[in-house]
């Protein structure tokens, strides 16, 4: 499984990139707005830091507008993947963009049927929202399992990006469920490193070493 960062914050991306294990970045209009910068400016800075898929989302909700925005964004850099919302016009746009060789990421997916439609349209990625489903009393991880089974049954090439990851346990769960990618906030990435016994072990090793030197 691969790890993407779900952020538009350049400092977080720089820190994540320094690990050498981050394979891509996902953004959305909310994350871009939080940075108070132009979408294209932010995206171009991100592609200079991470050599992998960088998801940038369209703002238009109509078919023509989505295709137009997608064409403009895709011309900025080969690594840019266009995030398209899971709607009727969105799926139409994905089908068109797929035929043009433009990579797409269908976002705001909350059901296996939606993921099936995205794959049939030729989406490069599909993003089921695990945490948001959990918030409404549904099982977000089970949705990943359902999508994985369907995709394997019919040999779909669409990759599953587990999105709306709230904590490290989600990462473990979606990895076991078969997600191709987990896109995580920087906070969750840092939490994945932590375990009290790791800290205790390091402290003991250092204490023993210092005692020996005396």
From Swiss-Prot:
Pfam families referenced in this protein's UniProt entry, alphabetically: TAL_FSA (PF00923)
SUPFAM superfamilies according to UniProt: Aldolase
- CDD domains, from UniProt? Transaldolase_FSA
Organism, by scientific name, is Carboxydothermus hydrogenoformans (strain ATCC BAA-161 / DSM 6008 / Z-2901)
Question: Does the keyword field hold Transferase?
Answer: yes
Can you tell me which residues the record assigns to a coiled coil?
Answer: none
Task: Identify the gene encoding this protein.
Answer: tal
Q: In which pathway does it act?
A: Carbohydrate degradation; pentose phosphate pathway; D-glyceraldehyde 3-phosphate and beta-D-fructose 6-phosphate from D-ribose 5-phosphate and D-xylulose 5-phosphate (non-oxidative stage): step 2/3
InterPro entries with a match to the protein in the record: Aldolase_TIM, TAL/FSA, Transaldolase_3B, Transaldolase_3B/F6P_aldolase, Transaldolase_AS, TSA/FSA_arc/bac
Instruction: Give the family, as the similarity comment puts it.
Output: Belongs to the transaldolase family. Type 3B subfamily.
What's the catalysed reaction? D-sedoheptulose 7-phosphate + D-glyceraldehyde 3-phosphate = D-erythrose 4-phosphate + beta-D-fructose 6-phosphate
Q: By its UniProt entry, which NCBIfam families does this protein fall under?
A: fsa_talC_mipB (TIGR00875)
Listed GO molecular functions? aldehyde-lyase activity; transaldolase activity
Key word Ribonucleoprotein present in the record?
no
* Record function comment: Transaldolase is important for the balance of metabolites in the pentose-phosphate pathway.
Spell out the protein name for this chain: Probable transaldolase
**One term under GO cellular component:** cytoplasm
Cite the entry's keywords alphabetically.
Cytoplasm, Pentose shunt, Schiff base, Transferase
Localization: Cytoplasm
- Main localization is cytoplasm
One BP annotation, GO: carbohydrate metabolic process
Catalytic residues as annotated in Swiss-Prot or TrEMBL: 83 (schiff-base intermediate with substrate)
Enzyme group, top EC level? transferase
E.C. designation(s): 2.2.1.2
């Amino acid at each position: 499984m691969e790890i993407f960062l779900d952020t538009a914050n350049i400092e977080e991306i720089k820190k994540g990139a320094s690990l050498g294990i981050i394979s891509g970045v996902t953004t959305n209009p909310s994350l871009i707005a939080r940075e108070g910068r132009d979408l294209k400016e932010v995206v171009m800075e991100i592609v200079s830091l991470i050599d992998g898929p960088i998801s940038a989302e369209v703002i238009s909700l109509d078919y023509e507008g989505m295709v137009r925005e997608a064409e403009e964004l895709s011309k900025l850099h080969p690594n840019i993947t266009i995030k398209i919302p899971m709607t009727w016009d969105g799926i139409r746009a994905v089908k068109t963009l797929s035929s043009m060789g433009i990579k797409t990421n269908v976002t705001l997916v909350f059901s296996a049927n939606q993921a099936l439609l995205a794959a049939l349209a030729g989406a490069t990625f599909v993003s089921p929202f695990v945490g948001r489903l959990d918030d409404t009393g549904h099982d977000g991880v089970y949705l990943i399992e359902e999508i994985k089974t369907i995709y394997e049954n019919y040999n779909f090439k669409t990759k599953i990006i587990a999105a709306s990851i709230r904590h490290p346990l989600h990462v473990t769960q979606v990895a076991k469920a078969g997600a191709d990618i987990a896109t995580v906030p920087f906070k969750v990435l840092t939490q994945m490193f932590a375990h009290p016994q790791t800290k205790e072990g390091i402290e003991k090793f250092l204490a023993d070493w210092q005692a020996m030197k005396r």
